[in-house]
Every structure is written in C-alpha cells, then in structure tokens.
C-alpha cells in the first residue's frame, strides 16, 4: 500500500512539473516568439500585384503621392517612377524640428508636418515656401490629400512626450492651395496617418477608436472601439478597412458601416500600419515578428521572427515583403512563405517604413543614414547621410527625402 502511495505522489509531482514546464514554455514563447512558415498555396492572390490598379495618369500628375504609403493599400511602391541614384541635392529646407513621418506630394507642392506643430507646403520644384501653419501641437503622422484638401492629424500640445491618454486631438482640413483651415474634427490624440476613400476620412485615436468621418458633413459616420490606443494608420481594399491597435489585435471592418468582419491577435503591440497585397495583410509587431494574415479570413498564414522590435511598416513588390527591424537588419521576405530572400546589415535599428521605386528599396536607420538597395538582391547602390524614420516619396521629377530636421529635393545626377 505504501509503495502505491509513493508511486501516486511521484506521478502527481511529475504532472505538476510537466504543467509548470508547459506554462513556462507558453510564457517563454510569448516573450521569444518564433517563425511560422507559410505557403503560397493558401490565400495567396498572385495577380493582386501592387500598382496594377493605378490611378488615371492625369490624376497621378496632379497628386503623385497622395497619402502615407502611396496608395490605399499602403504598398509603398509607386509604379511609373523611374528615378535612380546617384542623386544630387536640388534643394533643402530646414524644418526646425524632427520629421517623424514623410511628406505627401500634390498640386506641385510637398506637404509635411514637423514634430513641434509646424506644417509647411513647399514648391516641389524649388523648395520655396508656399504657405505654413503653426498649430502648436505635436505632429507625428503624414497628412493625406484629396480633392484640393489636405488633412493633418494633431496630437497634444508640444512636446510630444507629455501626452496623456485622455488628452484631446484633432484632424484639421486645410485648403491645399492657400493653407486656410476649412474645418477640424475633435477626437482623442491622433497619431495615425489618415486615409480618404470616397467621402470618408479614416483615422484612429489614442481614445481607442477608429473613426470614419464624412468629409462633406464633418460628422462621424461610425466609430469602432478597440481595447487600447490606435497609433498606426488604416489600409483599405475591396470595401474593407484594416487597422491595428495596441491591444495586440488586427481588425478588418466594413469600410461603410464599421461592422467587424474579423480580428486576429499577435503576442505584443502593433505599432505598424498594415500593408495589403496578394490577398494578404502584412504587418510588424513589437514581439519582433512580421505577420501575414488572410485578407478575407484573418487566418495567420505565416510569422517571421526578425530578432528585434518591428515598428516599421512594410513595402511590397514582386511578391516580396520589405521591412526593417530593431535588430539592425533589413529584410526581404517571400510574400508566400515568409522565407528570407535576403537581408542587409544596416548598422543601426530601423524604425521607419521603406519605399520601392524603380526596383530600388529605400529606408533609413536610427543612425541617421538612408540606404538604397537593389530590391532583387539587397546590394547597396546608394547611401545618404541623413534620414531617420520613413524617408522617401517621389513624383516624376524628384525624390523627396525626409531627414532628421530637413527636407531634401533630389534629382538624378545628370538628369
């Protein structure tokens, strides 16, 4: 009998040890999440290539770079722009404060907001000041342009570090030609780069809500609550709005009604803006992984560990996902499987998003350098001694580079 009791106690101890080990493994896995390999045989639309559904040429000439990430899908790939390095600086303009997000380009002007609340419109050809506004509120997002109006989010009064979660924020609507304020919408602190689709202006707020505001009535059509602050912009495709929250979730909602279609979880915060291509949602997470979810289902298709936080939003081109990591490496990942096609040691953490132009992928590091790599093989083609976050946008004549406190207009050498 005693022997049976001893065996029973030993079995119980083993079960407890196994349970503790299993729980410990789950905790370890959450803190050190690994790679989950995917396949292009599941929810992969090869024909959904970035840049295929291009805007009319006349519209592109007037508004060559209308929003953060170039298009509604935030692909960060601009078709038809064939500007290649080496570049010469045609002009440069000091902003007096940090440029955390890149400009947009429209109506032959470049529009950008600096961290201290200064918003400027520069002549694209010369860099001369067209108009400026002083908001006195922190700006940590790109504007968006639609039908003659520039929409810029505002945070709490400068400096940015003193923000409170319940502080007010705004999105202001400015006449793109004169800078006149047309109207503003109050929400919580707004850090997300907005998006206009049709008559609806979409943006998220630290008040935990995603907003859809009618640009004609200036009223909210719907709001969608999440479990934490929204700090990254939304993306749009096929009638669905995709966005992420600091509640560790990605959401897909009906763009007209705000009705939830699906939500999916990561193991830490999502700061990055989603990128949509090939029927998938690509997004980085502070757990150090890049995720691919199905646009229609929300199913996890792959997750790639990078060795450091992924604040960077992704660019997509030629069935490849381009993204930087705090591990100081820049990655080109197979969009189908998540496998590494190539990687590049950038020498410093990467926080901002890349851009692909004419087969070259551009990105900056926190070491204040900007690189241009051959997007096919990762070979370094160009380097510039400024830039910190999301550096490059373009039109048919210039590449515009957001440095730490300067904006540059670049021209191809000899062009």
Q: What is the predicted function of each stretch?
A:
Residues 17-22:
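Alpha-helical transmembrane segments
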Residues 9, 23-24:
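Intrinsically disordered, low-structural-confidence terminal and linker regions
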Residues 113, 125, 216, 244, ...:
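Glycine-rich phosphate/oxyanion-binding loops and their immediately adjacent helices
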Residues 1-16:
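N-terminal Sec-pathway targeting helices
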Residues 25-30, 59-70, 96-118, 137-171, ...:
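Repeat-blade elements of multi-bladed beta-propeller folds
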Residues 75-79, 116, 123:
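Short, glycine/acidic-enriched capping/hinge loops at junctions between secondary-structure elements
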Residues 24-101, 128-135, 170-175, 180-186, ...:
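Aromatic (tryptophan-biased) beta-strands that constitute blades/sheets of beta-rich domains
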């Amino acid at each position: 009998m005693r022997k049976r009791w001893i065996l029973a106690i030993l079995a119980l101890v083993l079960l407890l040890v196994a349970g503790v080990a299993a729980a410990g493994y789950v905790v370890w896995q959450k803190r050190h999440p690994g790679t989950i390999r995917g396949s292009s045989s599941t929810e992969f639309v090869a024909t959904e290539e970035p840049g295929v559904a291009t805007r009319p040429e006349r519209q592109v000439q007037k508004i060559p770079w209308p929003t953060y990430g170039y298009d509604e899908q935030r692909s960060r790939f601009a078709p038809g722009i064939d500007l290649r390095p080496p570049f010469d600086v045609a002009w440069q303009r000091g902003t007096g404060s940090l440029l955390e997000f890149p400009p947009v380009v429209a109506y032959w002007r470049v529009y950008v907001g600096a961290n201290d609340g200064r918003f400027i419109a520069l002549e694209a050809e010369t860099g001369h000041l067209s108009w400026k506004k002083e908001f006195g509120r922190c700006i940590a997002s790109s504007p968006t342009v639609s039908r003659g109006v520039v929409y810029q989010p505002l945070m709490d009064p400068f400096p940015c570090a003193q923000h409170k979660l319940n502080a007010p924020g705004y999105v202001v609507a400015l006449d793109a030609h004169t800078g006149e304020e047309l109207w503003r919408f109050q929400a919580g602190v707004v850090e997300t780069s907005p998006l206009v689709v049709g008559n609806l202006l979409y943006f998220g707020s630290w008040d935990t809500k995603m907003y859809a505001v009618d640009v004609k009535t200036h009223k909210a059509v719907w709001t969608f609550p999440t479990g934490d602050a929204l700090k990254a912009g939304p993306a749009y495709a096929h009638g669905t709005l995709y966005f992420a929250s600091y509640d560790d979730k990605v959401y897909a909602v009906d763009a007209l009604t705000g009705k939830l279609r699906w939500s999916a979880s990561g193991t830490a915060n999502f700061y990055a803006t989603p990128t949509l291509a090939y029927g998938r949602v690509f997004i980085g997470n502070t757990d150090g992984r890049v995720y691919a979810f199905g646009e229609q289902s929300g199913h996890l298709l792959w997750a790639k560990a990078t060795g450091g936080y992924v604040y960077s939003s992704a660019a997509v081109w030629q069935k490849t996902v381009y993204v930087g990591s705090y591990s100081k490496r820049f990655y080109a990942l197979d969009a189908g499987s998540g496998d590494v096609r190539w990687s590049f040691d950038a020498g410093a953490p990467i926080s901002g998003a890349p851009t692909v132009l004419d087969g070259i992928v551009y990105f900056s590091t926190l070491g204040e350098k900007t690189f241009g790599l051959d997007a096919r093989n990762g070979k370094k083609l160009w380097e510039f001694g400024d830039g910190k976050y999301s550096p490059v946008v373009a039109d048919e004549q210039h590449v515009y580079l957001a440095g730490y406190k300067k904006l540059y207009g670049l021209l191809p050498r000899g062009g």
